[in-house]
Amino acid sequence: MSADSLFLCPQCRQPLPVRPPCSCGFLLRESNGVINLITDEESAAVQPFLEAYEQVRQDEGWGGDDLDLPFHPRRHLEIWSIRQRTFRKFESIVADLSRGTALDIGAGNGWMTRHLDRWGFDAIAVDINTSPMDGLRAGQKFIDEGASFLRVRSGMERLPFLSERIRLLATNASFHYASDFRIALSEFERVLTPGGIIAIVDSPFYENAADGERMMAERVVEFRRKYGMPETFARRSRYLTYKDLEEMVRSLNLSCQVLPVWPGFRRSYEAIRAKFAGRNIAEFPVVVIEKHFAMGSNRDTSHGS
């Protein structure tokens, strides 16, 4: 994988040359194995949120030594029991997909990126979080153990990749952090090859926006009480409705499947109790979105890269 065949300058949005700097002056830098493809302005803008996010993650016990995921977690066992099922569903979906470049958007420590590499993809972990606790730098453990993947610092709304180069784009418990869902999905469509797929995994969906708004309002109160967190930061993690998803997909001329995943006995019981109380809890389906081939083009069904 070479920079001239894949990367886009985050500053001028032109193909990034092999020999830096870019003609606009942007200089590609790598630190602790992470390729920085975010502008200084973007980095400064997101830093306050990252500091607040890290505080919550540490308090809730995420990251650190909990890396052998999703099947051997040390903490949050109930959450990971659900994610094991969504992971298996995701694995079955990509089994017959032509291999090529795969992005793990919002990759965190790269535990899913490691699996993409094992399955034969040219895998890239993408995240704005480079923390050694649960961000991109934490992925060094997998690389030391033999995994092969790149780590790129970037936001999901301005991906630093050339158009139509990505075979698979997975958002792993991360799409709900997008500041604008439609802009992010439009970027995903731009970089995807015809016939490639987008998989939205472990993001909360609701039938009705009122239930999602209730969840967010409760989080705002909790995070203000526990961390003194501003409302804008507490609302960075959002939700989707099935109607909004359908409208976004249609507007971008994509096709979509929503595949339900059984959440387990406990959460099923919680869903029943919530309905009796006149509300609904979040669902976590696997959403598969496909980019169509252009009229008259030849479908490539090979399994080569």
Where do the protein language model's features map onto the residues?
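A conserved beta-strand element that flanks and buttresses the S-adenosyl-L-methionine
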Residues: A170
